[in-house]
Amino acid sequence: MAEQGRGQRGSGYGLGLSTRTQVTGYQFLARRTAMALTRWRVRMEIEPGRRQTLAVVASVSAALVICLGSLLWSFISPSGQINDSPIIADRDSGALYVRVGDRLYPALNLASARLITGRASNPHLVRGSQIDSMPHGPLVGIPGAPSDFNPASPATSSWLVCDTVAGPSTMPQSPHGVTVTVIDGTPDLTGHRRVLKGSDAVVLRYGGDAWVIREGRRSRIDATDRSVLLPLGLTPEQVTQARPMSHALYDALPVGPELVVPEVPDDGAAATFPGAPGPVGTVIVTPQISGPQQYSLVLTDGVQTLPPLVAQILQNAGRPGNTKPVTVQPSSLAKMPVVNRLDLSAYPDDPLNVMDIRDNPSTCWWWERTAGENRSRVQVISGPNIPVAPHEMNKVVDLVKADMSGREADQVYFGPNFANFVAVTGNNPAAQTTESLWWLTEAGARFGVEDTKEAREALGLGLTPSPAPWVVLRLLPQGPTLSRADALVEHDTLPMDMSPAELVVPK
């Protein structure tokens, strides 16, 4: 029976191995016994073994994080080994050095260091002890050259020359009452600023002449010629009391035809075409069934269409034998030959809408060209102040060498979409040629750039330069030329600036 019982137990429990529940129970009893012997308590609230395991895992994890962080920081900010770095800077003092052969030379600026090495490298930061371990040479480079190179060449190049006439709301910056501001970038046209269109105009004076500024150009006008003033909606006082214009704005604005009584060739002579209603110089008026009357002028070999305002000017001039227009029916006018001999583009279609300079003391000449276009756009902006956003006004830089004569810029501002690597182009809207290359700093200085592949690559100026009219660039103070020959120069001392300005330190 006992043997039979053992057989039954063997068939029911297999080999009699321990189950998982028995093993975990045994381990629990062992840990409880160890805790009873070591801590004199059997409540399993804290297990020392598990705490030790967690401590080891946490320590290993922290060590790995520290090692990975150190590795990453070594790439971001290396410890500073000179090795073969061509341009070196002292990590503590920031002093700049250029490496030529086995000798370090103190460099005046980054432009000089790049031109000497021929590479557009940034300074490699090292410890001063490493710099002291190498032989040194004298000071090298171009005095006054820039150290900041972040070239920008937008698709649309935009430049402005602005005059701000001193008044109750503007502080006079110039003894002549005009502040000249150069703006590189897109103007801000909010805040009652407007682009002059149609009959909009500004009347300013330069020297002894008065000028009507509209449609991107200036036209001279005589304050004593009432036959022209009245149709234009101007008074002699508006012209004689016009506020001054700077030489910079005067040069930037292309000159247009003078606003005078149009000079008619062979005035008073007999017209040579059949059916002429009168001699040369006769003003013709043609009634229309719908719309305003049409005016024309009899010339030697035909008739030229006149704007009503020009017809009024000719009538005001009181030419002999032509005191009033001659009425010609449309059917008769249609048989007369049409010519276009007189340039009447300076005259508006309607009386001028003159901007009040007291409310709009700022006048800007705006030059703009987009890449791929054959012509530039020239417009005039008028407003209460220069076209700079209010929150950007603190970025307008007052130039140290502002001459306050209106021949150079007094202020400069780099606005949105500014260009700092430019090629000079002509002032003519159709100009396609590009000449010298220039690098501009946000302090308002311009530096000529040697037009060679080596110099441009060394300075990191590989992009295509934006066009910029010379009439604007010449208003900025000029710095030295950035060339390799000028950079390969040693100095014991540097010349002193003979016309510095005092730095005012707030108390």
From Swiss-Prot:
Q: Provide any one GO MF term from the record.
A: hydrolase activity
> Where is it found, in Gene Ontology cellular component terms?
extracellular region; plasma membrane
Pfam family membership, one? T7SS_ESX1_EccB
| Membrane topology note | Single-pass membrane protein
What does the record give as EC number? 3.6.-.-
Its annotated compartments are: Cell inner membrane
Q: List residues traversing the bilayer.
A: 56-76
Q: Which cysteines are joined by disulfide bonds?
A: none
Which keywords label this protein?
Answer: ATP-binding, Cell inner membrane, Cell membrane, Hydrolase, Membrane, Nucleotide-binding, Transmembrane, Transmembrane helix, Transport
Please give the subunit comment from the record.
Part of the ESX-5 / type VII secretion system (T7SS), which is composed of cytosolic and membrane components. The ESX-5 membrane complex is composed of EccB5, EccC5, EccD5 and EccE5.
Matches recorded under NCBIfam families: T7SS_EccB (TIGR03919)
What function is annotated for this protein?
Answer: An ATPase. Part of the ESX-5 specialized secretion system, which is responsible for the secretion of EsxN and a number of PE_PGRS and PPE proteins.
- Report what the protein is called: ESX-5 secretion system ATPase EccB5
